[in-house]
Amino acid sequence: MTLTNYVQEVSLADFGKPLHHKAYWNKRLKTTGGRFFPKDGHLDFNPRMLEEHGELIFRKIVRHELCHYHLYFEGRGYHHKDRDFKDLLAQVNGLRYVPTSSKSKTNHHYSCQTCGQVYQRKRRINLAKYVCGNCHGKLMEKNQS
Protein backbone atom coordinates (compact mmCIF):
# COMPACT_ATOMS: atom_id res chain seq x y z
CA MET A 1 0.00 0.00 0.00
CA THR A 2 1.43 3.38 -0.96
CA LEU A 3 1.46 6.36 1.38
CA THR A 4 -1.18 8.18 -0.67
CA ASN A 5 -3.48 5.14 -0.50
CA TYR A 6 -2.97 4.89 3.26
CA VAL A 7 -3.78 8.59 3.76
CA GLN A 8 -6.86 8.22 1.52
CA GLU A 9 -8.01 5.28 3.64
CA VAL A 10 -7.55 7.28 6.88
CA SER A 11 -9.38 10.24 5.35
CA LEU A 12 -12.39 8.15 4.37
CA ALA A 13 -12.49 6.16 7.62
CA ASP A 14 -11.96 9.03 10.09
CA PHE A 15 -13.33 12.06 8.23
CA GLY A 16 -15.75 10.53 5.73
CA LYS A 17 -14.19 12.69 3.01
CA PRO A 18 -11.92 11.76 0.09
CA LEU A 19 -8.35 12.95 -0.42
CA HIS A 20 -7.91 14.55 -3.85
CA HIS A 21 -4.16 15.19 -3.69
CA LYS A 22 -0.99 13.16 -3.15
CA ALA A 23 0.98 12.35 -0.01
CA TYR A 24 4.77 12.04 -0.03
CA TRP A 25 7.54 10.91 2.31
CA ASN A 26 9.96 13.73 3.12
CA LYS A 27 13.06 12.56 5.01
CA ARG A 28 14.31 16.15 5.36
CA LEU A 29 11.65 16.84 8.00
CA LYS A 30 13.43 16.81 11.36
CA THR A 31 11.17 18.24 14.06
CA THR A 32 7.71 17.77 12.60
CA GLY A 33 5.57 14.77 11.77
CA GLY A 34 4.11 16.19 8.59
CA ARG A 35 3.25 19.27 6.55
CA PHE A 36 0.27 20.44 4.51
CA PHE A 37 0.89 22.69 1.50
CA PRO A 38 -2.17 24.87 0.81
CA LYS A 39 -0.71 26.14 -2.48
CA ASP A 40 -0.99 22.78 -4.25
CA GLY A 41 -2.75 20.63 -1.62
CA HIS A 42 -0.16 17.88 -1.18
CA LEU A 43 0.95 16.44 2.16
CA ASP A 44 4.48 15.56 3.33
CA PHE A 45 5.19 13.08 6.12
CA ASN A 46 8.30 12.30 8.13
CA PRO A 47 9.20 8.60 7.65
CA ARG A 48 11.09 8.51 10.97
CA MET A 49 7.83 9.06 12.88
CA LEU A 50 6.52 5.74 11.56
CA GLU A 51 9.82 3.97 12.28
CA GLU A 52 10.32 5.36 15.80
CA HIS A 53 6.76 5.60 17.13
CA GLY A 54 4.78 2.96 15.24
CA GLU A 55 1.62 2.95 13.17
CA LEU A 56 -0.77 4.12 15.92
CA ILE A 57 1.10 7.40 16.50
CA PHE A 58 1.68 7.83 12.76
CA ARG A 59 -2.07 7.49 12.11
CA LYS A 60 -2.69 10.30 14.61
CA ILE A 61 -0.11 12.44 12.80
CA VAL A 62 -1.92 11.74 9.51
CA ARG A 63 -5.20 12.81 11.15
CA HIS A 64 -3.56 16.07 12.24
CA GLU A 65 -2.45 16.89 8.70
CA LEU A 66 -5.82 15.86 7.29
CA CYS A 67 -7.48 18.34 9.68
CA HIS A 68 -5.43 21.10 8.01
CA TYR A 69 -6.26 19.67 4.59
CA HIS A 70 -10.04 19.33 4.94
CA LEU A 71 -10.55 22.60 6.83
CA TYR A 72 -8.57 24.52 4.22
CA PHE A 73 -10.65 23.21 1.33
CA GLU A 74 -13.88 23.87 3.26
CA GLY A 75 -12.83 27.50 3.73
CA ARG A 76 -12.72 27.21 7.53
CA GLY A 77 -9.90 28.02 9.95
CA TYR A 78 -7.09 25.52 9.35
CA HIS A 79 -4.32 27.05 11.49
CA HIS A 80 -3.34 25.62 14.89
CA LYS A 81 -4.79 28.65 16.67
CA ASP A 82 -8.26 28.35 15.08
CA ARG A 83 -11.18 26.92 17.05
CA ASP A 84 -12.36 24.89 14.01
CA PHE A 85 -8.99 23.16 13.86
CA LYS A 86 -8.87 22.39 17.59
CA ASP A 87 -12.42 21.03 17.60
CA LEU A 88 -11.91 18.78 14.57
CA LEU A 89 -8.57 17.51 15.90
CA ALA A 90 -10.20 16.54 19.21
CA GLN A 91 -13.13 14.93 17.37
CA VAL A 92 -10.90 12.62 15.30
CA ASN A 93 -8.40 12.00 18.14
CA GLY A 94 -5.37 13.42 16.33
CA LEU A 95 -2.09 14.50 17.88
CA ARG A 96 -1.55 18.17 18.72
CA TYR A 97 2.22 17.76 19.15
CA VAL A 98 4.70 15.21 17.83
CA PRO A 99 6.30 12.97 20.49
CA THR A 100 9.96 13.65 21.14
CA SER A 101 12.55 11.42 19.57
CA SER A 102 14.13 8.74 21.74
CA LYS A 103 17.52 9.31 20.16
CA SER A 104 20.04 11.45 22.01
CA LYS A 105 20.65 14.80 20.36
CA THR A 106 24.15 15.35 21.76
CA ASN A 107 26.91 14.14 19.50
CA HIS A 108 30.09 15.56 21.04
CA HIS A 109 31.22 15.09 24.64
CA TYR A 110 33.99 17.20 26.17
CA SER A 111 35.50 17.28 29.66
CA CYS A 112 37.81 19.65 31.48
CA GLN A 113 41.28 18.23 32.21
CA THR A 114 41.50 20.21 35.47
CA CYS A 115 38.10 20.05 37.21
CA GLY A 116 36.40 17.24 35.24
CA GLN A 117 33.37 19.33 34.19
CA VAL A 118 31.51 17.52 31.37
CA TYR A 119 30.04 19.35 28.35
CA GLN A 120 27.67 17.89 25.75
CA ARG A 121 27.27 19.65 22.42
CA LYS A 122 25.50 19.07 19.12
CA ARG A 123 28.23 20.87 17.21
CA ARG A 124 31.95 20.35 17.41
CA ILE A 125 33.95 23.07 19.19
CA ASN A 126 37.49 24.34 18.59
CA LEU A 127 39.50 23.04 21.58
CA ALA A 128 42.32 25.52 20.93
CA LYS A 129 39.90 28.44 21.24
CA TYR A 130 37.55 27.45 24.09
CA VAL A 131 38.27 26.64 27.74
CA CYS A 132 36.27 25.39 30.73
CA GLY A 133 33.70 27.88 32.04
CA ASN A 134 34.35 26.88 35.66
CA CYS A 135 38.12 26.89 36.02
CA HIS A 136 39.45 28.03 32.60
CA GLY A 137 41.17 24.67 32.22
CA LYS A 138 41.90 22.95 28.94
CA LEU A 139 39.11 20.87 27.35
CA MET A 140 39.50 17.45 25.77
CA GLU A 141 37.08 15.40 23.70
CA LYS A 142 35.85 12.24 25.40
CA ASN A 143 35.87 8.99 23.45
CA GLN A 144 32.38 7.75 22.64
CA SER A 145 32.24 4.01 23.11
UniProtKB/Swiss-Prot annotation:
Cell compartments where the protein resides: Cytoplasm
GO molecular function list: zinc ion binding
Pfam family, any one: SprT-like
Co-factor binding details: Binds 1 zinc ion.
List of catalytic residues: E65
SprT-like domain mapped to chain residues: 4-140
Keywords: Cytoplasm, Metal-binding, Zinc
Segment forming the signal sequence: none
Binding site for Zn(2+): H64, H68
Keyword flag Cell wall biogenesis/degradation: no
Required cofactor names: Zn(2+)
UniProt feature coiled coil, ranges: none
GO cellular component: cytoplasm
Main location: cytoplasm
UniProt superkingdom: Bacteria
InterPro entries for this protein: SprT-like_domain (IPR006640), Uncharacterised_SprT-like (IPR023524)
Annotated GO biological process: response to stress
UniProt family annotation: Belongs to the SprT family.
Entry protein name: Protein SprT-like
Species per Swiss-Prot/TrEMBL record: Streptococcus pyogenes serotype M1
